[in-house]
A protein has these predicted regions:
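An anion-binding catalytic pocket shared by soluble metabolic enzymes
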Residues: 2-86
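Short glycine-aspartate micro-motif
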Residues: 90-91
Length: 91
């Protein structure tokens, strides 16, 4: 199993791949992956120019996060998917 830092970088790589393929409209796309009892998710206002592993936000299973960087405004939808679909490991 990958550690948190590897998952954070994988998330950034996925974000950049989705952006490069033209599947995001400016800062309107987000990616996440299941981690611990919650998820890692792209930050609010992310774009290809400012996303980095240290800006990825951990949101626990109750929707809590810490720090100055806010998770994507879509975090509730992502967390709901993980709660309802155990086989989902990334959104």
């Amino acid at each position: 199993m990958k550690d948190e830092n590897e998952l954070r970088q994988d998330l950034v790589d996925a974000y950049l791949t989705v952006d490069k393929r033209g599947l995001m409209n400016q800062a309107s796309g987000n990616v996440s992956c299941r981690f611990r009892d919650g998820m890692l998710i792209s930050p609010s206002g992310a774009d290809a120019e400012n996303i980095s592993a240290d800006r990825v936000v951990y949101v626990d299973g109750e929707g809590n996060y810490s720090g100055d960087i806010k998770p994507s405004s879509e975090w509730r939808m992502h967390l709901s998917i993980y709660k309802k679909q155990e086989s989902a490991n990334a959104v």
